[in-house]
């Protein structure tokens, strides 16, 4: 082995676009796995601030506990700047219910709902209905497809009726 030759790892040999795609796919599934991934090596860590990664980063743990996002302000700011639906939902919930900025942050919940975030669709629909914007609220509610009966329930439905 030649001591003057610098060896590169297989990961370093991959194109940066592919590395960003890997990090983005991991981020969609789990924020914890994303965090571990970007800490694992500098090549993957370089993709941490990529627009595609931040737009699709799964913030499900923060969606469940929005007030805990105060511990993660930097990643929240980055995700908001890249139109991450989860980040908009979290900001909207905090500002709407906790800080009482109803008009401004109904907008953030709306962005999240339009981005397909299920909790945001429900919350936005309910808030619109409560504000008297009935048709708009019904439109968002219909996106949840609750009116459709799943096939498995149709099969079970007849057997479980109480008479």
UniProtKB/Swiss-Prot annotation:
InterPro entries: At1g67623-like, At2g35280_TPR_dom
Domain F-box: residue ranges: 8-57
Pfam families: TPR_27
Domain of life: Eukaryota
PANTHER family registered for this protein in UniProt: NUCLEIC ACID-BINDING, OB-FOLD-LIKE PROTEIN, OS05G0482100 PROTEIN
Name of the protein in question: F-box protein At2g35280
